[in-house]
């Protein structure tokens, strides 16, 4: 006869999630709630994980920010996404400071990759390239500079 398997505790469930990837406290709480775990039990488990440094919102913020930079997103979009995780402002600021990226260079590389040898002196293509960077989370100044820089490179 098979023994009935004991349900994992809130702590065990949260730890199992953290083994796969970093999670914010809010995210873990939401996932535990979805599994039917009481809020009190979830908070106790999350406090314990935080004390043991298995769950750390500052580390989560930095990992997420680095991931988004490598995916080609700009600072506005990254900061907005970090904001959706209910992270402390200090954690978001520290994560943005830690990535130390030259945003103008990143935007320039994205345009070079996406538009290759297309003529960016054509106003319609330049507008599309600028809009692409704006949607990716770069500010207007950087987007305009990157498309202007690329159009000058092609004309030389």
Annotate each language-model stretch with its function.
Residues 1-156:
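An alpha-helical, amphipathic repeat domain used for nucleic-acid recognition
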């Amino acid at each position: 006869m098979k023994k009935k398997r004991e349900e994992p505790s809130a702590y065990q469930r949260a730890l199992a999630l953290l083994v796969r990837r970093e999670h914010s406290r809010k995210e873990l709480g939401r996932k535990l709630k979805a599994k039917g775990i009481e809020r009190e039990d979830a908070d106790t488990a999350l406090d314990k994980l935080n004390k043991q440094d298995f769950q750390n919102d500052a580390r989560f913020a930095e990992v997420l920010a680095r991931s988004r930079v490598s995916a080609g997103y700009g600072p506005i979009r990254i900061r907005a996404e970090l904001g959706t995780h209910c992270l402390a402002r200090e954690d978001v600021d520290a994560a943005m400071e830690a990535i130390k990226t030259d945003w103008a260079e990143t935007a320039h590389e994205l345009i070079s990759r996406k538009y290759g040898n297309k003529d960016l002196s054509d106003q319609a293509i330049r507008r599309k390239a600028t809009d692409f960077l704006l949607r990716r989370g770069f500010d207007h100044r950087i987007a305009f500079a990157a498309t202007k820089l690329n159009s000058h490179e092609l004309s030389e």
